[in-house]
């Protein structure tokens, strides 16, 4: 009886595990968390430097996946990161995503991004220019705090929520 029950449970769960497979992969120096079920990929932590261009799609295990988010701490303290190009498939920038990226000087947030999570660009002391495209809805607490070189920022009318201390410590 136990063998039949175990076999029955295995038959039920096996299709679920293959259908929702999640994995990590590094492609062209960028690390991704991939969910093939939803055909999505999230940029995750790696020791990035220089100019980084995130593609809109990646191929993983024969599946085309859209890069839809920049994960929590994806570029955490990547002090040698000088520029980032974010594709129009990204809808969110995670918590602490670019915290401490001191060599990053400018960033353009594409119109596909709806939310910039808290502390996303905290203490990016070299950041001078931020362009937020129309489409962004929410800028969470402390998103740009500590960016003491920030001299220009464009915030579109689409932004309906700006959290606390978003520009704290900016000159």
Outline where the language-model segments fall:
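Structural signature of tandem-repeat unit edges
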Residues: 29, 47-69, 79-92, 102-115, ...
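Positively charged n-region of N-terminal signal peptides that target proteins for export
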Residues: 1-4
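Secondary-structure transition/turn motif
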Residues: 36-51
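Short, ordered beta-strand-loop transition motifs
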Residues: 26-40
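Boundary at the C-terminal end of the N-terminal hydrophobic targeting segment
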Residues: 18-27
């Amino acid at each position: 009886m136990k063998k039949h029950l175990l076999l029955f449970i295995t038959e039920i769960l096996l299709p679920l595990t293959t259908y929702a497979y999640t994995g990590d992969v590094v492609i062209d120096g960028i690390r991704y968390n991939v969910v093939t079920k939803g055909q999505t990929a999230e940029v995750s932590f790696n020791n990035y430097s220089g100019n980084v261009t995130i593609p809109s799609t990646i191929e993983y295990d024969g599946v085309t996946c859209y890069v839809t988010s920049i994960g929590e701490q994806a570029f955490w303290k990547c002090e040698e990161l000088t520029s980032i190009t974010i594709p129009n498939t990204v809808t969110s920038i995670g918590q602490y995503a670019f915290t401490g990226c001191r060599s990053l000087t400018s960033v353009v947030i594409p119109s596909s991004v709806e939310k910039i999570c808290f502390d996303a660009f905290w203490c990016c002391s070299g950041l001078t220019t931020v362009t937020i495209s129309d489409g962004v809805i929410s800028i969470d607490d402390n998103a740009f705090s500590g960016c003491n070189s920030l001299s220009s920022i464009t915030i579109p009318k689409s932004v309906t929520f700006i959290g606390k201390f978003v520009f704290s410590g900016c000159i």
